[in-house]
C-alpha cells in the first residue's frame, strides 16, 4: 500500500514538471533588459495578429465624391448626385 502511494506521488510530480514545461512561459519569452535591468516580455502579442473584419463589405466599396458612378448612380449620401455628362458623383 505504501509503495503504490509513493509511486503515485512520484508519478504526479513527474507529470507536474512535464506539463509545466509545455504550459505557461516558455524559456526566452521573458528576459532581462541589458541597459536598465528591467524584465522585458518578449511574448508575441496575439491581439496584433488579428485582422479587422467587416460584415458589410459593400459599404466599403461605395463610390466617393468625384469618382465614377456608373449608369445606376450609386453615389454615397454625402454627394448623392451622379452627373449625366461626366458620370461622376457630385
Curated annotation (Swiss-Prot):
Domain description: The cysteine framework is IX (C-C-C-C-C-C-C-C-C).
UniProt keyword Signal present: yes
4-carboxyglutamate carried by residues: 67
Protein's name in the database: Conotoxin ba9a
UniProt organism field: Conus bayani
Known tissue expression: Expressed by the venom duct.
GO cellular component, one term: extracellular region
Subcellular locations according to the entry: Secreted
UniProt keywords, alphabetically: Gamma-carboxyglutamic acid, Hydroxylation, Secreted, Signal, Toxin
A Gene Ontology molecular function term of the record: toxin activity
Amino acid at each position: 500500500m505504501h509503495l503504490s502511494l509513493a509511486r503515485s506521488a512520484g508519478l504526479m510530480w513527474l507529470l507536474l514538471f512535464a506539463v509545466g514545461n509545455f504550459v505557461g512561459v516558455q524559456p526566452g519569452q521573458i528576459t532581462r533588459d541589458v541597459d536598465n535591468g528591467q524584465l522585458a516580455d518578449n511574448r508575441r502579442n496575439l491581439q496584433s495578429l488579428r485582422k479587422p473584419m467587416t460584415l458589410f463589405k459593400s459599404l466599403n466599396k461605395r463610390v466617393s465624391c468625384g469618382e465614377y458612378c456608373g449608369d445606376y448612380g450609386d453615389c454615397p449620401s454625402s454627394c448623392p448626385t451622379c452627373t449625366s455628362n461626366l458620370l461622376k458623383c457630385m
